[in-house]
Amino acid sequence: MKLPIYLDYSATTPVDPRVAEKMMQFLTMDGTFGNPASRSHRFGWQAEEAVDIARNQIAELVGADPREIVFTSGATESDNLAIKGAANFYQKKGKHIITSKTEHKAVLDTCRQLEREGFEVTYLAPQRNGIIDLKELEAAMRDDTILVSIMHVNNEIGVVQDIATIGEMCRARGIIYHVDATQSVGKLPIDLSQLKVDLMSFSGHKIYGPKGIGALYVRRKPRIRIEAQMHGGGHERGMRSGTLPVHQIVGMGEAYRIAKEEMESEMARLRGLRDRLWNGVKDMEEVYLNGDLEQGAPNILNVSFNYVEGESLIMALKDLAVSSGSACTSASLEPSYVLRALGMTDELAHSSIRFSLGRFTTEEEIDYTINLVRNSIGRLRDLSPLWEMFKQGVDLNSIEWSHH
């Protein structure tokens, strides 16, 4: 077993060696390096064929038509293209959008930008376990609501929203439904031929493909229109201009092909490891699970260790690559906005750690992690005056702390 142990698969994954090997064939003079938009020679045709194969591989994993897959630079761009693209195209119909407070920043900040442009956005607060109350969603829907954006799996706490029911609710009212599926694709079954989802964002690097490539699913029947955000040569049926990066697209396609083959057995394995990790720490005092194991992704475990400062905990766990929040926001010392939206105190939010497991995680690593966490928490609490006061029965909420 090698240290440090990587348990931050929700931030990014290593490229699968099978994917890397495939990508190498599309870079050099000896390989298929052509521009797929070059229609006048073999180099272009071969590149175009490789892109078509990858488009099919992605469509097959999610039950879509390959013509519904639009390549982008990643899920952040897909979220932007979906939300801004739909809002701009349908704004004559209405200017109201619904999302949730626990979405990824790529959705929240896109909605904030649209608010500056005159759109109105309702941000739903989830229930304590992170699940959106569908009655609240229904109550928020209005005649001028044009778009709902609610993710499939939350990147911090792993809870799974009921996108099938939300899709039915939106379709019944003629509202477009966008789903950020970055954390669920290849981990949970997705069948867009059955789901009433109109737009869905995907990433390559969360599923053992390369960084810098993603896709947006845009439904054809009923046809969804979006306004391009990137203008140029009219690539991707006019929705996203820019020369297609064939090596990255091929990598994403291969990663999705592997995921389709291995998803069922791999997710059962990861669920077992996640449960083993939780069972190994849950009997400690003042340890709380964030999210919901029953309605959760099999590979994410978010736990708060009360009376331990999150930053010092991460320092103590230097042999583990884990995070306190998502990589995009963990650089700031602010507690996770996702956990705060669940109604958690700043103290508890600060002491939370996200463990995300993946393809190369072993049972040995999980057992090492359990021991390390138990020892580190014990040591840090021994040093903590707050823990001492808590053990003496002092109600810490009743203390007036002096500001200095």
From Swiss-Prot:
<dbReference type="InterPro" id="IPR015424">
    <property type="entry name" value="PyrdxlP-dep_Trfase"/>
</dbReference>
<dbReference type="InterPro" id="IPR016454">
    <property type="entry name" value="Cysteine_dSase"/>
</dbReference>
<dbReference type="GO" id="GO:0031071">
    <property type="term" value="F:cysteine desulfurase activity"/>
</dbReference>
<feature type="binding site">
    <location>
        <begin position="75"/>
        <end position="76"/>
    </location>
    <ligand>
        <name>pyridoxal 5'-phosphate</name>
    </ligand>
</feature>
<feature type="binding site">
    <location>
        <position position="243"/>
    </location>
    <ligand>
        <name>pyridoxal 5'-phosphate</name>
    </ligand>
</feature>
<keyword id="KW-0963">Cytoplasm</keyword>
<dbReference type="GO" id="GO:0030170">
    <property type="term" value="F:pyridoxal phosphate binding"/>
</dbReference>
<dbReference type="Pfam" id="PF00266">
    <property type="entry name" value="Aminotran_5"/>
</dbReference>
<keyword id="KW-0663">Pyridoxal phosphate</keyword>
<dbReference type="InterPro" id="IPR010240">
    <property type="entry name" value="Cys_deSase_IscS"/>
</dbReference>
<dbReference type="InterPro" id="IPR015422">
    <property type="entry name" value="PyrdxlP-dep_Trfase_small"/>
</dbReference>
<dbReference type="GO" id="GO:0046872">
    <property type="term" value="F:metal ion binding"/>
</dbReference>
<keyword id="KW-0001">2Fe-2S</keyword>
<feature type="modified residue" description="N6-(pyridoxal phosphate)lysine">
    <location>
        <position position="206"/>
    </location>
</feature>
<feature type="binding site" description="via persulfide group">
    <location>
        <position position="328"/>
    </location>
    <ligand>
        <name>[2Fe-2S] cluster</name>
    </ligand>
</feature>
<feature type="binding site">
    <location>
        <position position="155"/>
    </location>
    <ligand>
        <name>pyridoxal 5'-phosphate</name>
    </ligand>
</feature>
<feature type="binding site">
    <location>
        <begin position="203"/>
        <end position="205"/>
    </location>
    <ligand>
        <name>pyridoxal 5'-phosphate</name>
    </ligand>
</feature>
<keyword id="KW-0808">Transferase</keyword>
<keyword id="KW-0479">Metal-binding</keyword>
<dbReference type="GO" id="GO:1990221">
    <property type="term" value="C:L-cysteine desulfurase complex"/>
</dbReference>
<protein>
    <recommendedName>
        <fullName>Cysteine desulfurase IscS</fullName>
        <ecNumber>2.8.1.7</ecNumber>
    </recommendedName>
</protein>
<dbReference type="GO" id="GO:0044571">
    <property type="term" value="P:[2Fe-2S] cluster assembly"/>
</dbReference>
<dbReference type="InterPro" id="IPR020578">
    <property type="entry name" value="Aminotrans_V_PyrdxlP_BS"/>
</dbReference>
<comment type="similarity">
    <text>Belongs to the class-V pyridoxal-phosphate-dependent aminotransferase family. NifS/IscS subfamily.</text>
</comment>
<dbReference type="InterPro" id="IPR015421">
    <property type="entry name" value="PyrdxlP-dep_Trfase_major"/>
</dbReference>
<feature type="binding site">
    <location>
        <position position="183"/>
    </location>
    <ligand>
        <name>pyridoxal 5'-phosphate</name>
    </ligand>
</feature>
<keyword id="KW-0408">Iron</keyword>
<comment type="function">
    <text>Master enzyme that delivers sulfur to a number of partners involved in Fe-S cluster assembly, tRNA modification or cofactor biosynthesis. Catalyzes the removal of elemental sulfur atoms from cysteine to produce alanine. Functions as a sulfur delivery protein for Fe-S cluster synthesis onto IscU, an Fe-S scaffold assembly protein, as well as other S acceptor proteins.</text>
</comment>
<dbReference type="GO" id="GO:0051537">
    <property type="term" value="F:2 iron, 2 sulfur cluster binding"/>
</dbReference>
<comment type="subunit">
    <text>Homodimer. Forms a heterotetramer with IscU, interacts with other sulfur acceptors.</text>
</comment>
<dbReference type="InterPro" id="IPR000192">
    <property type="entry name" value="Aminotrans_V_dom"/>
</dbReference>
<feature type="active site" description="Cysteine persulfide intermediate">
    <location>
        <position position="328"/>
    </location>
</feature>
<comment type="pathway">
    <text>Cofactor biosynthesis; iron-sulfur cluster biosynthesis.</text>
</comment>
<keyword id="KW-0411">Iron-sulfur</keyword>
